[in-house]
Amino acid sequence: MFVSFLVGMVVGMVVGMATRAHTDGVRLAGQAGQVRREIGNDWWIRLVCRLSHGHWRVHRERPVVRDLGSPWQDTVASERTGWRTRAAWLHGEHVFAVDYRVCRRCRIGWVESPATFEPYRRCGLATAGLIALRADHPGLTWHTLGGHFPVSQPFWESVGSGVPGGYAQGALCPHVDRG
């Protein structure tokens, strides 16, 4: 009897935490248009790469991910030189992030590696983040670099519906470095 009481309490706590995470995630998705941008785009790294015709790369240490005090943040990407990261923060931790790159000359945008922390999946964070990116960069055709995992195919079909390019796999243009 005591064991079933404990199990009931634990299950109740887990369900309560999941419900709170979902509610918080939905609320955060609704704030996707409130973005704080970190200044800095590694212009000097791109200059060195351009002057050396891509033969010499500057390797930098992985930047520290820091909270800028806004629910949604746009910062220099930590793993791809010249790319940026759009991330959602909740309770001092990032719960969603996607790397992106834009070529204004070719009117193309790429997104890579969207990731949502488990308790906040299916709250609309990824969809809201991608919509906000498109709003910040209107008139672009949107692609991804890599193929899509079979399990993520429904997600890409959903978020790509009606979007120019549809987040289909697309190579980088000559003006953009893979990072």
Locations of the language-model features?
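Non-catalytic substrate-recognition and accessory regions of acyl/acetyltransferase enzymes
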Residues: 1-121, 131-143, 147-179
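Conserved G/P- and acidic residue-centered "switch" motifs that form tight phosphate/ATP-binding loops
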Residues: 124
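Residues forming the Rossmann-fold NAD(P)(H) cofactor-binding site
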Residues: 127
